[in-house]
Amino acid sequence: MEDATIENGCLWAMPGGHEAGLKRRFRRAADGGTEFEELDDSPFPDIELVPLEASAGTLVILHGYLPHWSGPNRSSKSRHAYSIHLVEAGADYPAGNWLQRAQPARGFD
Protein backbone atom coordinates (compact mmCIF):
# COMPACT_ATOMS: atom_id res chain seq x y z
CA MET A 1 0.00 0.00 0.00
CA GLU A 2 2.84 2.39 0.87
CA ASP A 3 6.62 2.39 0.75
CA ALA A 4 8.28 0.70 3.74
CA THR A 5 11.65 2.27 4.50
CA ILE A 6 14.10 2.24 7.38
CA GLU A 7 12.85 5.70 8.33
CA ASN A 8 9.19 4.65 8.57
CA GLY A 9 9.90 1.34 10.28
CA CYS A 10 10.22 -1.35 7.60
CA LEU A 11 10.61 -5.01 8.52
CA TRP A 12 14.05 -6.34 9.47
CA ALA A 13 14.97 -10.01 9.16
CA MET A 14 17.75 -12.45 9.96
CA PRO A 15 18.81 -14.18 6.71
CA GLY A 16 18.76 -17.95 7.22
CA GLY A 17 17.44 -17.53 10.78
CA HIS A 18 14.50 -19.84 10.02
CA GLU A 19 16.95 -22.76 9.90
CA ALA A 20 17.52 -22.49 13.67
CA GLY A 21 13.90 -23.48 14.36
CA LEU A 22 11.24 -21.56 16.22
CA LYS A 23 12.76 -19.91 19.29
CA ARG A 24 9.89 -17.70 20.41
CA ARG A 25 6.41 -16.86 19.26
CA PHE A 26 4.16 -13.88 19.64
CA ARG A 27 0.96 -14.83 21.41
CA ARG A 28 -2.21 -13.31 22.79
CA ALA A 29 -1.88 -12.56 26.52
CA ALA A 30 -4.63 -13.20 29.06
CA ASP A 31 -5.33 -9.46 29.29
CA GLY A 32 -5.94 -9.27 25.53
CA GLY A 33 -2.53 -7.73 24.78
CA THR A 34 0.38 -9.57 23.22
CA GLU A 35 3.58 -11.09 24.57
CA PHE A 36 6.46 -13.33 23.54
CA GLU A 37 6.52 -16.98 24.59
CA GLU A 38 10.08 -18.36 24.84
CA LEU A 39 10.33 -21.82 23.26
CA ASP A 40 14.12 -22.09 23.07
CA ASP A 41 16.35 -19.73 25.05
CA SER A 42 19.53 -20.55 23.13
CA PRO A 43 21.02 -17.50 21.40
CA PHE A 44 20.12 -16.65 17.83
CA PRO A 45 22.86 -17.29 15.28
CA ASP A 46 25.33 -14.42 14.94
CA ILE A 47 23.84 -13.13 11.69
CA GLU A 48 23.56 -9.47 10.76
CA LEU A 49 19.99 -8.28 10.35
CA VAL A 50 18.93 -6.81 7.03
CA PRO A 51 16.21 -4.25 6.36
CA LEU A 52 13.41 -5.41 4.07
CA GLU A 53 12.67 -2.08 2.46
CA ALA A 54 9.83 -2.40 -0.04
CA SER A 55 8.15 0.00 -2.42
CA ALA A 56 4.37 0.31 -2.56
CA GLY A 57 2.84 -2.73 -4.26
CA THR A 58 5.66 -5.11 -3.29
CA LEU A 59 4.80 -8.57 -1.94
CA VAL A 60 7.04 -9.72 0.92
CA ILE A 61 6.85 -13.43 1.82
CA LEU A 62 8.42 -14.76 5.03
CA HIS A 63 8.92 -18.31 6.30
CA GLY A 64 6.94 -18.81 9.52
CA TYR A 65 10.13 -19.44 11.52
CA LEU A 66 12.07 -16.45 10.16
CA PRO A 67 12.98 -14.04 12.97
CA HIS A 68 11.68 -10.64 11.91
CA TRP A 69 10.34 -7.41 13.39
CA SER A 70 9.69 -3.86 12.40
CA GLY A 71 11.38 -0.82 13.80
CA PRO A 72 9.67 2.32 15.03
CA ASN A 73 8.31 4.78 12.50
CA ARG A 74 10.61 7.79 12.94
CA SER A 75 9.20 9.71 10.01
CA SER A 76 6.13 11.81 9.34
CA LYS A 77 4.96 9.23 6.76
CA SER A 78 2.59 6.36 7.49
CA ARG A 79 3.38 2.70 6.83
CA HIS A 80 0.08 1.03 6.01
CA ALA A 81 0.26 -2.53 4.70
CA TYR A 82 -1.84 -5.66 4.39
CA SER A 83 -0.66 -8.73 6.28
CA ILE A 84 -1.96 -12.10 5.10
CA HIS A 85 -1.09 -15.23 7.05
CA LEU A 86 -1.42 -18.59 5.30
CA VAL A 87 -1.59 -21.79 7.33
CA GLU A 88 -1.85 -25.30 5.92
CA ALA A 89 -5.21 -26.98 6.57
CA GLY A 90 -3.72 -29.73 8.75
CA ALA A 91 -1.37 -27.48 10.71
CA ASP A 92 -1.67 -27.08 14.48
CA TYR A 93 -2.67 -23.44 14.88
CA PRO A 94 -2.44 -22.54 18.59
CA ALA A 95 -5.53 -20.90 20.07
CA GLY A 96 -3.23 -18.39 21.79
CA ASN A 97 -1.71 -17.16 18.52
CA TRP A 98 -1.50 -13.37 18.58
CA LEU A 99 -3.84 -13.11 15.59
CA GLN A 100 -6.68 -14.76 17.51
CA ARG A 101 -8.99 -12.20 19.03
CA ALA A 102 -11.00 -12.75 22.20
CA GLN A 103 -14.35 -14.43 21.66
CA PRO A 104 -17.02 -13.64 20.92
CA ALA A 105 -15.84 -11.60 17.97
CA ARG A 106 -17.66 -8.30 17.81
CA GLY A 107 -18.92 -6.36 14.83
CA PHE A 108 -20.29 -9.25 12.81
CA ASP A 109 -23.90 -9.22 14.05
Predicted regions and their residues:
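Double-stranded beta-helix
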Residues: 4-66
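Non-heme Fe(II)/2-oxoglutarate
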Residues: 13, 26-27, 56-61, 65-109
